[in-house]
Amino acid sequence: MMKVELIDRMGTDLSVVNAARVSYSKTKDVFDGKDEKLIKYLAQHEHWSPFAHASLQFRIKAPIFVARQLVKHQVGLVWNEVSRRYVDFPPELYKPDSWRGRPQNSKQGSDGEVKLDQTINHNMETTMESCLILYNSLLQKGVAPEQARMVLPQSMMTEWYWSGTVYAFARVCNLRCKPDTQKETQDVANVIDKLAGEAFPYCWMYLRK
């Protein structure tokens, strides 16, 4: 089961406008309508640096194939992940509720549900289980976890801390909340979108496109 938690945050919408106004040696204690207008202006004209003074920290659990899409976002973000070099507890594997078809006119994304017979679904279950059995056998034979992990599938669940600026996470969501994003990745991005919007409502309103 995938999971997204907001662990920590630094700053508020007011922090962003105060970072912008310091250029004129001014700050405010209470957020008002003028501050909203300033945030809107900063976002529309891509003055990104004030938004880098506010940040979010998430803990995320998702399958490897989702994590490897999201880790491509590097600017303004840092990532620390569970390492199978150091741990060898039993892996958890992701299993989809349904299968989606290949789209007709695109190299990415997916279409409607594809019905598979029980044999194929059984083969998937068996293959995943075989990977876990082989992994455990290698460990029992004394193989190092850093090498034994090579037999684990991309459906293996992983966890990571993901921290970054409000601006950086808005860029993630602007790309990964789109309909043509892989659904599983989109599911993670949609939760980030919701939590970030609650933490920084005005910044998020104008940074999200």
Language-model-detected regions and their locations in the chain:
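Family-specific signature for flavin-dependent thymidylate synthase
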Residues: 1-209
